[in-house]
Design a protein with these regions (language model features):
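Iron-sulfur cluster-binding cysteine motifs and their immediate structural context
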Residues: 52, 227-251, 268-295
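A short, charged helix-loop
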Residues: 208-211, 247, 252-255
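Auxiliary alpha/beta "docking" domains used to position bulky ligands
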Residues: 36-221, 260, 269
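Alpha-helical scaffold domains
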Residues: 260-346
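Cationic, low-complexity basic patches in intrinsically disordered or flexible, solvent-exposed regions
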Residues: 13
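Short hydrophobic targeting helices and cationic amphipathic motifs
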Residues: 4-6, 10, 19-22, 35
Length: 346
């Protein structure tokens, strides 16, 4: 380990060692600033810090207009398969051009966070909740982590301007993740990582700082496999990695307002909130390690809930158990609508 690596490592622990006598640590200010030199060094330390914060992977790409991805988004919107998700058409230019989001944007830092749970629902007859919603809302968790990463960048460089994005702003997250070398787009439209599968959250920092950009060799490792397409109970996965959003169980149970169409009766396979069927059958998700994020751990109470418990589930139960959870998006009323629809399913 050279002196630079030692200094950086010790700064992370808020101590600096006398290089001539490593047994005598000396405390230094927590906000000590190092000015790094060179795009390569800056990029290296940003990626290292991302991993230290708990992200599972980090890549960097140039902030620029993405004409191919903009065209694909337009085709999807024009096809009329977005259902009631009209917001997808908003801020179209910003979705494909980060320079419309951050003035003078030069780099997009993409991060990946595993959320695969170590525990599952106990009762196989109980209504199923998507794994992404087991714990605290990922928007909150990842935003906190990204803000820490942003603060770190400000400490190792000249003043930097930027914004953090987690699935709640006009950003083509999967496209940026591919450019950063974090994975490829599967036939179910999900980003798939060879190391982490597809039970992953994505986030970005768009900043006006130039960095060294990853140049990944993007490969499609889906091959001839069609398990996700074959397993989808509503036929929502179309050719060319296109998903019919208006025909997806996740759309009906989370985004859809009003009643769920009668034509979907008998096709939800007991999915109460969201759907993981296309991911559960994916070969790349067969040997996953559970996440290491405490905030994503579920409340043990609802993991133990039986079918009967759900039938007697009250609004006060909902507010207590699912506080700060993704289930707050559909609210108690929406969850009960879904539950009643499932009861008609059988």
């Amino acid at each position: 380990m050279n002196d630079l690596h030692l200094l950086r490592f010790s700064w992370e622990l808020d101590i600096i060692f006398n290089l001539k006598n490593l047994t005598l640590p000396m405390l230094v200010p927590k906000r000590r600033i190092y000015f790094m030199t060179g795009l390569k060094e800056n990029s290296h330390w940003i990626k290292e810090k991302a991993l230290l914060l708990g992200f599972d992977a980090c890549g960097i790409s140039r902030a620029e207009f993405m004409p191919d991805d903009a065209s694909r988004l337009k085709d999807w919107l024009d096809a009329g398969i977005s259902g009631e998700m009209h917001y997808m058409a908003n801020h179209f230019e910003k979705r494909s051009n980060p320079q419309k989001l951050v003035e003078g944007a030069k780099s997009v830092i993409s991060v990946l966070l595993n959320y695969y749970p170590g525990e599952k629902q106990k009762d196989p007859a109980s209504p199923v909740i998507s794994k992404y919603a087991y714990g605290e809302d990922y928007h909150f968790v990842m935003k906190r982590m990204l803000k820490e990463l942003m603060a770190y960048i400000g400490e190792i460089s000249d003043p930097v301007n930027g914004r953090a994005f987690v699935d709640s702003a006009p950003v083509l997250e999967r496209a940026w993740a591919v450019r950063a070398g974090l994975g490829w787009i599967g036939k179910n439209g999900m980003l798939i990582s060879k190391e982490h599968g597809s039970f992953i959250f994505l986030g970005e920092l768009v900043i006006d700082m130039e960095l060294e950009y990853d140049k990944p060799e993007v490969k499609d490792y889906c091959g001839t496999c069609t398990r996700c397409i074959d397993a989808c109970p509503t036929g929502a996965i179309l050719p060319e990695r296109v998903v019919d959003g208006s025909n997806c169980i996740s759309y009906f149970t989370i985004e859809k307002k009003g009643d769920i169409p009668a034509k979907m009766k008998g096709r939800f396979r007991n999915r109460l909130f969201g759907c993981d069927i296309c991911q559960d059958v994916c070969p790349w998700n067969k040997r996953l390690k559970p996440h290491n994020i405490p905030e994503f751990n579920p409340d043990p109470e609802w993991l133990e809930m039986s079918e009967e418990d759900w039938a007697n589930f009250s609004e006060s139960d909902f507010n207590r158990i699912f506080k700060d959870s993704p289930l707050e998006r559909t609210k108690y009323k929406g969850l009960m609508r879904n539950l009643k629809f499932l009861q008609k399913d059988f």
